[in-house]
Amino acid sequence: MPLLCALLRSRLQPSLLRSLTLTSAQSLSCGGSRGVRTWSARTGPGACADPAVSVSKRARAEDDASLRFVRLSEHATAPTRGSARAAGYDLYSAYDYTIPSMEKALVKTDIQIAVPSGCYGRVAPRSGLAVKHFIDVGAGVIDEDYRGNVGVVLFNFGKEKFEVKKGDRIAQLICERILYPDLEEVQTLDNTERGSGGFGSTGKN
């Protein structure tokens, strides 16, 4: 009997040690005893959840990534994207406009938006309008806290008047990350290699 017990111990000890080593490694990789092993759609089963980030905080962060909008009238058209990876959402005119040559117009979309937290909305031209009709966009910044009717300033640099019809795509809205730095007045600034050179100082072309 003592010989049988010794043989059993010699066979069980290596597997037991491997099990204990694996358990310790998992515990360390998950941040000790506070680590939580869970299923994640991104990392797969057994991923370690950060105990410092609650489920509600993660949900709020995901909600903040949405571009929310409200239709202010029955004339409004919901923004759309041309493809899944398109940089901007197309904006649509809510009314008919006529823009004379070398003139501008404020085109209403009749939508109200809330850009994601930490972003601003940049209203950019549509390449098709620029190439075919010499239409450009101005004053294209939508602040994070703006809640008014989104209007697009269109400039007609063409020789002919430009007709905007209700439901036409007039511009694209791009959400860009932004910093909100504090303003600090100082006596001097650090010197740089470029210095005060500007307006073509870096080259002829």
UniProtKB/Swiss-Prot annotation:
Keywords: Cytoplasm, Hydrolase, Magnesium, Metal-binding, Nucleotide metabolism, Nucleus, Phosphoprotein. The modification Phosphoserine is found at residue 54. Its EC number is 3.6.1.23. Expressed in all tissues examined. Higher levels in heart and kidney. GO terms for molecular function: dUTP diphosphatase activity; identical protein binding; magnesium ion binding; peroxisome proliferator activated receptor binding; pyrimidine deoxyribonucleotide binding; signaling receptor inhibitor activity. Substrate binds at residues 126-128, 140-143, 151, 199-200. The keyword Phosphoprotein applies. Pathway: Pyrimidine metabolism; dUMP biosynthesis; dUMP from dCTP (dUTP route): step 2/2. GO terms for cellular component: cytoplasm; nucleoplasm; nucleus. It is an enzyme of class 3 (hydrolase). Gene3D superfamilies: 2.70.40.10. It catalyses: dUTP + H2O = dUMP + diphosphate + H(+). It is found in: Cytoplasm; Nucleus. It comes from the Eukaryota. One of its GO terms (biological process) is dUMP biosynthetic process. Its cofactor is Mg(2+). Belongs to the dUTPase family. Each trimer binds three substrate molecules. The ligands are bound between subunits, and for each substrate molecule, residues from adjacent subunits contribute to the binding interactions. Catalyzes the cleavage of 2'-deoxyuridine 5'-triphosphate (dUTP) into 2'-deoxyuridine 5'-monophosphate (dUMP) and inorganic pyrophosphate and through its action efficiently prevents uracil misincorporation into DNA and at the same time provides dUMP, the substrate for de novo thymidylate biosynthesis. Inhibits peroxisome proliferator-activated receptor (PPAR) activity by binding of its N-terminal to PPAR, preventing the latter's dimerization with retinoid X receptor. Essential for embryonic development. Homotrimer. This is Deoxyuridine 5'-triphosphate nucleotidohydrolase.
